[in-house]
Design a protein with these regions (language model features):
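Sec-dependent signal peptide recognition
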Residues: 1-7
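Amphipathic, well-packed alpha-helical segments that form the structural scaffold of globular domains
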Residues: 48, 52-56, 124-127, 131
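Hydrophobic h-region of N-terminal signal peptides that target proteins for export
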Residues: 9-17
Length: 176
């Protein structure tokens, strides 16, 4: 092999080795999922972007055919995220009727600003919980947190869709 070709082969191997990232851990994967559904735009819009600039009146608007409003969807996310977080932390949970409709229908536009603030706080608490959890706790909680993130992404998409129907969505925020 010619010296130049050998040097190029060694150099490319060294460059590839430097670009190699450490393998993902359960903690890093869960944090990535939490961040992308909370406040870091990636393949889809996170909740903080989906509700940004939405007024209480806009949050209460319901599309035809009985679909949920953006406010009802955000309230539902707050309810389930808070409830599961309380369970993971070993805290007592608020009373639940067992009727999932209640997790949407108890929304009141007067509480819109509080719903947005509390949802942001709950998402931050999840992130802190995952950052400080033991490996054993993460192994136990991983599937539940992953499911919560999937649930969040699903309803965030609905919020964006409702806003598009309403005409209150700014496509510059990530979804054209």
């Amino acid at each position: 092999m010619k010296p130049a070709a050998a040097a190029l082969l060694i150099l490319s191997t060294l460059c590839m080795a430097q670009d190699k990232q450490p393998p993902a851990t359960l903690r890093s994967l869960l944090l990535q999922e939490l961040h992308t559904t909370h406040n870091k735009a990636d393949w889809f819009v996170p909740i903080n972007v989906a509700v940004d600039g939405l007024t209480a009146q806009q949050a209460s608007w319901q599309p035809p055919a009985g679909s949920h409003s953006a406010g009802q969807l955000a309230y539902h996310l707050l309810f389930w995220n808070r409830r599961v977080l309380q369970r993971l932390k070993g805290e007592s949970q608020e009373k639940y009727s067992g009727k999932n409709d209640d997790t949407f229908n108890n929304f009141d536009d007067k509480q819109w600003a509080d719903v947005v603030k509390q949802l942001d706080e709950v998402m931050k608490e999840y992130e802190k919980l995952v950052e400080s959890a033991s490996d054993q706790q993460l192994a136990s909680w991983g599937a539940t947190i992953g499911t919560i993130c999937t649930h969040n992404a699903y309803h965030i998409g609905q919020i964006v869709y409702v806003r598009k129907l309403q005409g209150s969505w700014n496509p510059e925020k990530g979804v054209k």
